[in-house]
Design a protein with these regions (language model features):
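Conserved binding/catalytic microenvironments
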Residues: 72-176
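Extended, domain-scale alpha-helical bundle/helix-rich regions
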Residues: 44, 50-69, 73-76
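Short amphipathic recognition helices of helix-turn-helix/homeodomain-type DNA-binding modules
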Residues: 1-41
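Alpha-helix boundary/N-cap detector
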Residues: 46, 50, 109-112
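Residues at alpha-helix termini
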Residues: 39, 59-62, 143
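Residues within well-ordered alpha helices
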Residues: 35, 55-58, 139
């Protein structure tokens, strides 16, 4: 009897996994996967199941169905349009900003220091982007802010976003 119970439980688990995979395949179709693969965010593939596994890893979830709320809690963003696909593109872009921000070393958040370096930051805008970006990253990093520059994903209508990740503030900007 125990053997029959084990076989039954295994079949139920497989059926559940197959149903979840089918649900995740339909969700994966909404993401701009080919653009994400072109940018190197996920491995390129044409197989739906591989896309699901790659997106699960990218979003750090066991099932894509868990991404019902596509936004990072507390995210503030600037975008100039909206459609159903734009939310998925925004979620992918914001997740990449989150992942990249984890590799940036920052001091603890210090708003007073930020206030004191704002004039220096404004002065950097007069310089060439190649020279001011490293300086800007350093100044903001000393204030507990990680700045991430990411390419624009078509359909996201996104210019930038800010959110808190761990113990630092993240500013993500699109590069157009």
């Amino acid at each position: 009897w125990n053997n029959l119970e084990a076989i039954y439980r295994e079949k139920v688990a497989r059926a559940t996994d197959e149903n979840e995979l089918e649900e995740d395949i339909s969700i994966a179709k909404e993401f701009p996967y080919s653009k994400m693969a072109t940018l190197g965010w996920v491995p390129p593939t044409r197989k739906a199941e591989e896309k699901v596994w790659n997106l699960r890893g990218f979003f750090e979830v066991a099932r894509l169905g868990l991404l019902e709320i596509l936004r990072i809690p507390g995210i503030a963003y600037r975008k100039v349009g909206e459609n159903s696909k734009s939310n998925y593109a925004l979620a992918a872009w914001a997740q990449k900003a989150r992942l990249d921000s984890r590799t940036i070393l920052t001091s603890p958040v210090n708003i007073d220091k930020l206030s004191s370096v704002l004039s220096d930051i404004r002065a950097l805008t007069l310089e060439d982007p190649e020279s001011f970006c490293p300086k800007l990253r350093q100044l903001l990093g000393e204030c507990g802010i990680a700045i991430v520059f990411l390419p624009h994903i078509s359909g996201s209508f996104l210019h930038g976003a800010t959110f808190i990740e761990g113990n630092h503030i993240v500013i993500g900007l699109t590069v157009r």
